[in-house]
UniProtKB/Swiss-Prot annotation:
SUPFAM superfamilies: WD40 repeat-like. It comes from Arabidopsis thaliana (Mouse-ear cress). The lineage of its organism: Eukaryota, Viridiplantae, Streptophyta, Embryophyta, Tracheophyta. WD repeats lie at residues 22-61, 112-151, 153-191, 198-237, 242-281, 284-323. Pfam families: WD40. GO terms for cellular component: Cul4-RING E3 ubiquitin ligase complex; nucleus. This is Protein ANTHESIS POMOTING FACTOR 1. Disruption phenotype: Altered shoot apical meristem (SAM) and increased growth rates, as well as prolonged vegetative phase and delayed bolting resulting in an impairment of flowering under long days (LD). Altered expression of FLC and SOC1. Component of a chromatin regulatory complex involved in regulating chromatin structure in the nucleus. Promotes flowering under long days (LD) via the regulation of bolting. It is found in: Nucleus.
Length: 330
């Protein structure tokens, strides 16, 4: 369903519409293409999978046994991805790969990180991208160049995000510190720093709303904060049940009016952040949801654990069965 104006009623009507259950382990990361109806997933079975979200079909699967698959995001091209590695980081240094799903080919390796990449973000306006690693660094890259374009050394686990104009990027770290940089002159240091007081946990994820007015922080102890992106003030916050060993992900809706998140008890939640209140709570049968994202241009979100689910407004019909893979490469 195409994206219409969201309201509390439509959000409450969201229900599971398709299920893909043939993953060989936990799903690590999911990402939508900005303009095409495509979704990519990475999972514990070392696979990358491409989905047509308009028709709920799996289009392709490729396996990457040498490096594994961890964080993944689309570039601007609908068949090109950036994927981080899980294996051989110390021996090869090949922490990131630029690859083509069209012919399962590595287009470029990006070396530098000495530990897992836990945050990955593509610029919305050019070929730049950022990666944050457990080696306590954020690196800035250009798809056209092998060498790292810049490095920022930090304390603790970093989370990174560009705003939707690509002019500003944010880095969040433990203790609730959020630093904002001008992407054109980041070497001058942050132009603003916010502190989310009272929470000493590491930040697991950070996102900007599409309108650039809000930021969404998720911590490793399952607290969620919505911040004013201009002043750094906390607009609202939510606490979820703990999920031992499984970080949860929260997401904005495209209009920036709602936030959705999983919880350690296996439930899903939606809040209206303009008048902070919970508007929906869903039970699901797939366990703790570790990956959750709302589609950029559709009334649809995906939730994943070891199973991938597509959620759409309930029209009274039964969930659609998932199609089998149409293309598979080793």
């Amino acid at each position: 369903m195409s994206l219409t104006e969201l309201d509390d009623g439509l959000v409450r009507r969201m229900a599971m519409g398709a299920v893909f259950s043939d993953f060989g382990g936990k799903i690590h990361s999911v990402g939508f293409h900005r303009t095409d109806d495509l979704l990519v997933t990475s999972s514990e079975d070392d696979s990358l999978r491409l989905f047509d979200i308009a028709n709920a079909k799996q289009l392709k699967i490729t396996y990457h046994k040498k490096h594994g698959t961890d964080r993944v995001c689309f570039t601007h091209h609908p068949s090109s991805l950036i994927c981080s590695s899980r294996y051989n980081l110390e021996s090869t240094g090949e922490s990131l790969r630029y690859l083509s799903m069209y012919d399962n080919r590595i287009l470029r390796y990006f070396k530098g990180h000495k530990d897992r990449v836990v945050s990955l973000c593509m610029s919305p306006i050019n070929d730049s991208f950022m990666s944050g690693s457990l080696d306590r660094s954020v690196r800035l890259w250009d798809l056209r160049v092998n060498a790292c374009q810049g490095i920022l050394h930090l304390r603790g686990r970093p989370a990174v995000a560009y705003d939707q104009q690509g002019l500003v990027f944010a880095i969040a770290m433990e203790g609730g510190a959020v630093k904002l940089f001008d992407s054109r002159c980041y070497d001058k240091g942050p132009f603003d720093t916010f502190l989310v007081g009272g929470d000493t946990a590491e930040v697991n994820d950070i996102k900007f709303s599409n309108d650039g007015k809000s930021m969404l922080l998720t911590t490793t102890n399952n607290n969620i904060y919505v911040l004013d992106a201009y002043r750094g003030e906390k607009k609202c916050g939510f606490s979820l049940e703990p999920s031992q060993g499984t970080p949860i992900e929260a997401t904005f809706t495209p209009d920036g009016k709602y936030v959705l998140s999983g919880s350690g008890d296996g439930t899903l939640h939606a809040w209206n952040i303009e008048n902070p209140s919970e508007v929906a709570r869903w039970e699901n049968n797939i366990g703790v949801v570790s990956c959750l994202k709302w589609a950029p241009r559709r009334a649809m979100f995906v939730a994943a654990s070891t199973v991938l689910t597509f959620w759409i407004p309930n029209d009274g019909e039964s969930p659609a069965p998932a199609d089998p893979p149409t293309d598979q490469q080793q």
